[in-house]
């Protein structure tokens, strides 16, 4: 499924609002789970992974009102490691969480370009607007200006272009003539010449609607006798290549893109826990069920089975609770 349709697929949700919800007993359960010596991690998992983000915010307010403590700070003091990172991620309102991930990606030692590319290429215009607003409120600076300060060259240009959200056009109308012209322009900017006109690629990939781009990719393959992905791989490299390929993947099928992100977060030695946590948390109330279906189709195993193989303890249990039953 193309990326712009993924946001309206209600059947994709794995974490739903709890029926007959009352934040006061939930807050009390969490308080008792962390009171005194030791912590009842399972009680924390049972409450926070089975409530929607809106409900978690209500629980946090009740916790503060009843016990005079900040719930997130209390969780941080009681938990540790990857489990703490996951549970704290659940407590952020969605746009503030993504703003935090972007801020951390730029302010850590060495910029994590992959995180920035993932978020900017896969969100809609309205979501990007909310993320930018949350970023400025929480960090006192402009997301666009921080990206410009932290990246350079063509990568900076494509990220700033993506931030404008110009691809978020759900119109089904496509001008065949313009699509064909764009395909010819891409061919002329890469395969046809020695060297590459990167700005032509950036302009077309980041300013055309998703429906239009799908037609462009079809026309391009007829002209070049190779896919747009193969041309990007041969014409660019590094983070710019990753950014362009991500735009193409998200345009073609957003669920497959996230399935791939989750798979490679766990494949091979070690686990990219940041990628695993971010994508499970951020997609759990949007389309994680659909991502799970694509994951199984693409890799011949379920997302939950791979989580069981690759993680352990309370961290594993919390992830599995968020992911839900197998497709």
From Swiss-Prot:
Keywords: Annexin, Blood coagulation, Calcium, Calcium/phospholipid-binding, Hemostasis, Metal-binding, Repeat
Entries under InterPro entries matching the protein: Annexin (IPR001464), Annexin_repeat (IPR018502), Annexin_repeat_CS (IPR018252), Annexin_sf (IPR037104), ANX8 (IPR009115)
One cellular component term from this protein's GO annotations in UniProt: cytoplasm
Record-linked Pfam families: Annexin (PF00191)
Each Annexin repeat, start to end: 21-92, 93-164, 177-249, 253-324
Name by which UniProt lists this protein: Annexin A8
Function: This protein is an anticoagulant protein that acts as an indirect inhibitor of the thromboplastin-specific complex, which is involved in the blood coagulation cascade.
GO BP term, example: endosome organization
GO molecular function, one term: calcium-dependent phospholipid binding
Domain characteristics, as noted in the entry: A pair of annexin repeats may form one binding site for calcium and phospholipid.
Xref: PANTHER family: ANNEXIN, ANNEXIN A8-RELATED
Family per record: Belongs to the annexin family.
Binding annotation for Ca(2+): 266, 268, 270, 310
Species assigned in the record: Pan troglodytes (Chimpanzee)
């Amino acid at each position: 499924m193309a990326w712009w349709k993924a946001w309206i697929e209600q059947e994709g949700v794995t974490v739903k609002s709890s029926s007959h919800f009352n934040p006061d007993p939930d807050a009390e359960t969490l308080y008792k789970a962390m009171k005194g010596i030791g912590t009842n991690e399972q009680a924390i998992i049972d409450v926070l992974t089975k409530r929607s983000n809106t409900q978690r915010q209500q629980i946090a307010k009740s916790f503060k009102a009843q016990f005079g403590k900040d719930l997130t700070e209390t969780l941080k003091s009681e938990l540790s490691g990857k489990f703490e990172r996951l549970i704290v991620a659940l407590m952020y309102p969605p746009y503030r969480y993504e703003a935090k991930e972007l801020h951390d990606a730029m302010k850590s030692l060495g910029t994590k370009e992959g995180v920035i590319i993932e978020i900017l290429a896969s969100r809609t215009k309205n979501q990007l607007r909310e993320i930018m607003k949350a970023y400025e409120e929480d960090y006192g600076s402009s997301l666009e200006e921080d990206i410009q300060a932290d990246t350079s060259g063509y990568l900076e240009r494509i990220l700033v272009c993506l931030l404008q959200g110009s691809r978020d056009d759900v119109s089904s109308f496509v001008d065949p003539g313009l699509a064909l012209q764009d395909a010819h322009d891409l061919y002329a900017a890469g395969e046809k010449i020695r060297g590459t006109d990167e700005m032509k690629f950036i302009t077309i990939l980041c300013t055309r609607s998703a429906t239009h781009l799908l037609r462009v990719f079809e026309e391009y393959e007829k002209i070049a006798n190779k896919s747009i992905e193969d041309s990007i791989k041969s014409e660019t490299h590094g983070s710019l290549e990753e950014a362009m390929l991500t735009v193409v993947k998200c345009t073609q099928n957003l669920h497959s893109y996230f399935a791939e992100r989750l798979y490679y977060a766990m494949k091979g030695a070690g686990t990219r826990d940041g990628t695993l946590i971010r994508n499970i948390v951020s997609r759990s109330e949007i389309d994680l069920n659909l991502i799970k279906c694509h994951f199984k189709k693409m890799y011949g195993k379920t997302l939950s089975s791979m989580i069981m193989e690759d993680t352990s303890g309370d961290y594993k249990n919390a992830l599995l609770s968020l992911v839900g039953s197998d497709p």
